[in-house]
Amino acid sequence: MVLDLDLFRVDKGGDPALIRETQEKRFKDPGLVDQLVKADSEWRRCRFRADNLNKLKNLCSKTIGEKMKKKEPVGDDEFIPEDVLNFDDLTADTLSALKVSQIKKVRLLIDEAIQKCDGERLKLEAERFENLREIGNLLHPSVPISNDEDADNKVERIWGDCTVRKKYSHVDLVVMVDGFEGEKGAVVAGSRGYFLKGVLVFLEQALIQYALRTLGSRGYTPIYTPFFMRKEVMQEVAQLSQFDEELYKVIGKGSEKSDDSSYDEKYLIATSEQPIAALHRDEWLRPEDLPIKYAGLSTCFRQEVGSHGRDTRGIFRVHQFEKIEQFVYSSPHDNKSWEMFEEMIGTAEEFYQSLGIPYHIVNIVSGSLNHAASKKLDLEAWFPGSGAFRELVSCSNCTDYQARRLRIRYGQTKKMMDKVEFVHMLNATMCATTRTICAILENYQTEKGIIVPEKLREFMPPGLQELIPFVKPAPIDQEPSKKQKKQHEGSKKKAKEVTLESQLQNMEVTEA
């Protein structure tokens, strides 16, 4: 995931000042741009010198061949005149004046200079890449410039009644329908572990089927992805911070051979976007085949580092969940990817409108975008039991930022193109099932249970097609109020004081 290096090169039509400005708008370090430009300039000089040295080496070999052909004496003099040691001014005429033994010595010295130059070039290349992968994509002009998403995310539109309030939150409702085992899940799987069971399993499967059917009718190809990826491929689709904050590492045997003692490092996927992005790695995609649209289905695994204390109860924010994802490879020309961007968020909106979930669409501020996104719109559903908007969908246009490192090129072959171009890649959540379940539970709660949204009824089993009944009391109704807790603690304290006073009185009587 990187920008085009030519964007940093003024002589190639690039504009480093624009990228520096983008970094500032993202509230990231603009100094990375200057460091990259410096490393790249030195790298280009180093490569130019290496090319010239290789030409000189070939010239030495050619000159030796010509002298041997003429049967000139080889000589045994390895002394090299000082002017010859200045390789920048070395010419064919200068070499012709030397003996074969001297030219061989010069060739060895050139070899040493090439090795030194190559070592320096590799070092500069690594330095350049370290800076390049931490510089974000160019921003779309409509992105709000701010580093405070709580205050400055721009609401683009609202659908449905986002003011209504209801009694219970999803934390209680998952228990009331007996569809969740949280404490036992935590014992088995650790923090945020859970068992989804009973009616909520059916509801989850109904959502998956409905989401896939909806996308299938819009030309998306359903695709069930691998759950883990090789490290070198994951590095091409995920930014560096994700390896520390989001991704789970899996260590396994290097091969299926019993005597193989090597180990292989893989990473569990955080979203099906990651393996689908790599599906056409190292390919040329023909213009007539675009757009290519996939409906990704996978289990997703996320560490949620940095979310300590947030949404610790229920199933809204968990380490493992099912998700259906929209993923599109688009043409980089004629604004096609931005038209597709609007189409994808529109598809998500139609899906949640059909489920009767109120929401608003927010344009995410520049400081909260990941490196790849040029623009991101979120669909945040209204949760009437919690009295808050919560994110259900993220839709991003990454333009050619992801495709460049994955080498997914646009067109036929390099021979057919004046310049190599890369496809644009877009992703959008269709349905993260556990979050959507939470939204349905809060919006469709009644005194007796949860009304099943009409669009999901055909996918539900008999007896659960219209209403999911409450079978357990709400945990919040069983918890003592703060006042009751205070009174109870006060009574215990008073009883303890009375007991202590009685003991002291008994001690006095005994002593007397």
Swiss-Prot record:
The keyword rRNA-binding does not apply. The keyword Nucleotide-binding applies. SUPFAM superfamilies: Class II aaRS and biotin synthetases, tRNA-binding arm. One of its GO terms (molecular function) is ATP binding. Residues 479-499 have a biased composition (Basic and acidic residues). NCBIfam families: serS. Consists of two distinct domains, a catalytic core and a N-terminal extension that is involved in tRNA binding. Catalyzes the attachment of serine to tRNA(Ser) in a two-step reaction: serine is first activated by ATP to form Ser-AMP and then transferred to the acceptor end of tRNA(Ser). Is probably also able to aminoacylate tRNA(Sec) with serine, to form the misacylated tRNA L-seryl-tRNA(Sec), which will be further converted into selenocysteinyl-tRNA(Sec). In the nucleus, binds to the VEGFA core promoter and prevents MYC binding and transcriptional activation by MYC. Recruits SIRT2 to the VEGFA promoter, promoting deacetylation of histone H4 at 'Lys-16' (H4K16). PANTHER family: SERYL-TRNA SYNTHETASE. This is Serine--tRNA ligase, cytoplasmic. It comes from Cricetulus griseus (Chinese hamster). The gene is SARS1.
